[in-house]
Amino acid sequence: MGRKFCVGGNWKMNGDKASIADLCKVLTTGPLNADTEVVVGCPAPYLTLARSQLPDSVCVAAQNCYKVPKGAFTGEISPAMLKDLNIGWVILGHSERRAIFGESDELIADKVAHALAEGLKVIACIGETLQEREAGQTEAVCFRQTKAIADKVKDWSNVVIAYEPVWAIGTGKTASPEQAQEVHAALRKWFTENVSADVSAAIRIQYGGSVTAANCRELAAKPDIDGFLVGGASLKPEFIQIVNARQ
């Protein structure tokens, strides 16, 4: 069975009630390729608004959640709370969480494991900085981040990996389709050697570095690219074209 193409839109800390309602209208009108799974990462205050205004065919994700069900963790939200709001997905380990908020590989792995245990689906992000790429450490960094998650996760059926070359996020720089495919293929090989051939064949690996309507089709044609995690472009009507990159 082929891997179902999965496109995530990460709205980050953007939007208000009016603009999110507008985005929901764009997504509802589409048309969206029925063979592509679509997930939008919405700011926490607007999760219920987005869920209420989007068709069931579009999934809604939180952009973060904590590693325990409840307690004295001011400002955090738990997977149980997201489930209570009918939110089925969460984005974890995004490069901005790692860089700006200091989240470690281990914390992210704990969050992923807990979210899965609570019944959420997870987009787990990994990727290297420009310094790391220029030092030839791309694979070492991606494998280290993936191994941290693999040490805590046994069932991968509800995990999508998002490879984000950090140097290509919001910079207008893009990995070439060949560069992206090379890392995706290396990650799949890592899963074969360190998890299992079955997981390697089934797991979806999204590409997440400055994806636009202009470059999405060429990227989508690569054999190991199973979707995208889209930042800025997910706030614009061109997101529809990115969702439909395989049509």
UniProtKB/Swiss-Prot annotation:
CDD domains referenced in this protein's UniProt entry, alphabetically: TIM
Pathway the protein contributes to: Carbohydrate biosynthesis; gluconeogenesis; Carbohydrate degradation; glycolysis; D-glyceraldehyde 3-phosphate from glycerone phosphate: step 1/1
One Gene Ontology biological process: glycolytic process
Active site annotation, chain numbering: H94, E164
One Gene Ontology cellular component: cytosol
Catalytic activity: D-glyceraldehyde 3-phosphate = dihydroxyacetone phosphate
Enzyme Commission code: 5.3.1.1
Binding-site residues, substrate: N10, K12
Keyword set, alphabetical order: Gluconeogenesis, Glycolysis, Isomerase
Tagged with keyword Isomerase: yes
Gene Ontology molecular function: triose-phosphate isomerase activity
PROSITE patterns: TIM_1, TIM_2
Assembly, per entry: Homodimer.
Protein family (similarity comment): Belongs to the triosephosphate isomerase family.
Record's protein name: Triosephosphate isomerase
Species in which this protein is naturally found: Culex tarsalis
Record lineage: Eukaryota, Metazoa, Ecdysozoa, Arthropoda, Hexapoda
